[in-house]
A protein has these predicted regions:
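Catalytic-pocket segment enriched in acidic/His residues
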Residues: 1-107
Length: 107
């Protein structure tokens, strides 16, 4: 799986409680998603424990867990990303990242 992370990673002592991190996502400067890790269906400890049954996790491994409430498909009308959109996302204590949506050639 390819995904962006960073511009840095934080250690557990820098982050604090992983089950209490405010998350947000803006599209073109407009807030589309907000949430907190405390509302995750499965908690961080449960996810790490479950994955450890099937694989050996190593320091520095990143476990993508999904997205906060407010996905575009759930809006009325739906709000889908399009080429040229700028997506900025972040989390308290984690920093933020910014990406521009580009067209993908049809295959």
């Amino acid at each position: 799986m390819l995904f962006r992370s960073g511009p840095w990673l934080v250690t557990p002592d820098e982050l604090g409680d992983p089950q209490d991190v405010d998350l947000w996502l803006d599209v073109n400067g407009q807030r589309r998603q907000t949430g907190n890790t405390r509302t995750m269906i499965f908690g961080v400890a449960h996810i790490v424990s479950y994955l450890s049954r099937f694989m050996a996790l190593q320091p520095g491994d990143v476990i993508p867990t999904g997205t906060p409430p407010g996905v575009g498909m759930g809006h009325k009308p739906p709000l889908y990303l399009k080429a040229g959109d700028v997506v900025t996302l972040g989390g308290r204590g984690l920093g933020q990242q910014r990406q521009r949506v580009v067209d993908s050639p049809v295959r």
